[in-house]
Amino acid sequence: MSAQSALSGLGAKLLSGEVEVVDCTGVLGPNTPILQLPPDFAKNTPKVEIHKISEYDSDGPFFAWNWMVLGEHSGTHFDAPHHWITGKDYSDGFTDTLDVQRLIAPVNVIDCSKESAADPDFLLTADLIKAWEAEHGEIGAGEWVVMRTDWDKRAGDEAAFLNADETGPHSPGPTPDAIEYLLSKKIVGWGSQCIGTDAGQAGGMEPPFPAHNLLHRDNCFGLASLANLDKLPAKGAILIAAPLKIERGTGSPIRALALVPKA
């Protein structure tokens, strides 16, 4: 089948509903949970603000529009390699210089929802990924891998979403060996349903924050605060995760969409 025929076929199946578009994005607004870092460690991203310019009134009689205060890494978002010190030297590591061909790819969905419900500090290891592959098939080069935890169900309550106490945040994520294994498979990027791509306690790992550290070291991408991964199959969907083309952007809120064969 030619590429033209394949695209025509996909278009027809989208129009017929045989291929469903699943929104993997959380709502972006003033109540969106935002990562909170210790003030003695680093500055924090401000909360999202939406301010009205006009709404069919004296400030604009025929139109409605707003202006916003918005951090690059707010809500469902994309981490570019330049986001982390290990990726700082890539000329194509910004949101305006990256290769857009890489942004749309098959997605592997590793379901860790039961484990994460039982233990908020659950860690996905390389051995668990290999066991998943034995059941569902190999993870291919250039593909996305995302960890389903159903953490998005907490997004309406920032305290529950961040899940922090005096020992720090508690949320599921990958181990260093999990990320190294995925990088050996030549993935394009890794995604999480939590506030960031790492586990809550990842600061104590070696290296610290391995998803950030290792992914961006290898010029790969991260996705965070994904939603509705429970609507995706383990394999067979296509993920579209395109950041805004921000000049020298280290990341961007995204509208993450998945193309899924309708059951």
Swiss-Prot record:
Gene3D superfamilies: Putative cyclase. Its cofactor is Mn(2+). Binds 1 manganese ion per subunit. Mn(2+) binds at H73, H77, D79. It catalyses: isatin + H2O = isatinate + H(+). GO terms for molecular function: arylformamidase activity; hydrolase activity, acting on carbon-nitrogen (but not peptide) bonds, in cyclic amides; manganese ion binding. The active site is at H83. It comes from the Bacteria. Changing S225C: 2-fold decrease of the affinity for isatin and 4-fold increase of the catalytic efficiency. GO terms for biological process: L-tryptophan catabolic process to kynurenine. InterPro entries: KFase/CYL (IPR007325), KFase_sf (IPR037175). Pfam families: Cyclase. Inhibited by thioisatinate. Its EC number is 3.5.2.20. Keywords: Hydrolase, Manganese, Metal-binding. Substrate binds at F62, F63, A64, W65, N66, H212. Homodimer. Involved in the degradation of the plant hormone indole-3-acetic acid (IAA). Catalyzes the hydrolysis of the cyclic amide bond (lactam) of isatin (1H-indole-2,3-dione) to yield isatinate (2-(2-aminophenyl)-2-oxoacetate). Belongs to the Cyclase 1 superfamily. This is Isatin hydrolase. It comes from Roseibium aggregatum (strain ATCC 25650 / DSM 13394 / JCM 20685 / NBRC 16684 / NCIMB 2208 / IAM 12614 / B1) (Stappia aggregata).
